[in-house]
Amino acid sequence: MKRIESATAGQAGRLFDIMVRATELGCAAFYPPEVISIWHKGRSVEGMAGVIAQGGVYVLIDEQAVRGFVHFKDSEIVGLFVHPDDQRKGYGTELFRFAVGKMPVRPILIKATLNAIPFYAKLGCRKVRTESVRRHEHDIYVVRMKLS
């Protein structure tokens, strides 16, 4: 049975693995390998546990396994990741709709990787602008999207 619930510190390793695997595989056609490795530089399971402790991180569990997670704060989706083995099963859509339902303020903002644009567009989000995020002296291009 599927359910969405608050993430726990004990799930930090699984969430970190999902994030790394999803970005390595999902972003490979859109970003060079060195950019993807920079993205992960300095991130850790301990860091993920710290994010979970701050709240706003929810996991989707199906068949007793974490399949993906969403992290949101105020009216912004900070991250939404589904394990590559579990993509195209509707988990990302469920996590997105759950997060939107929890956010009291509109518009909702999303900072999306280039590969995620079609996913968010399908859910009614529109592109606002392309921007760069500076990480370890490199610019990583992402798209700011909005759901009104």
Where are these regions (language model features)?
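A conserved beta-strand-loop-helix scaffold within acyl/acetyltransferase catalytic domains
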Residues: 70-75
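Conserved acetyl-CoA-binding loop of GNAT-fold acetyltransferases
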Residues: 121-131
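Conserved beta-hairpin
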Residues: 55-68
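Conserved acetyl-CoA-binding loop-helix of GNAT-fold acetyltransferases
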Residues: 88-101
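A short, internal acetyl-CoA/4′-phosphopantetheine-binding micro-motif in the GNAT/acyltransferase core
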Residues: 77-87
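A short beta-loop-alpha structural element at the N-terminal edge
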Residues: 2-17
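C-terminal "cap" of GNAT-fold acetyltransferases
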Residues: 111-118, 131-148
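Conserved GNAT-fold acetyl-CoA-binding loop/helix
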Residues: 20-46
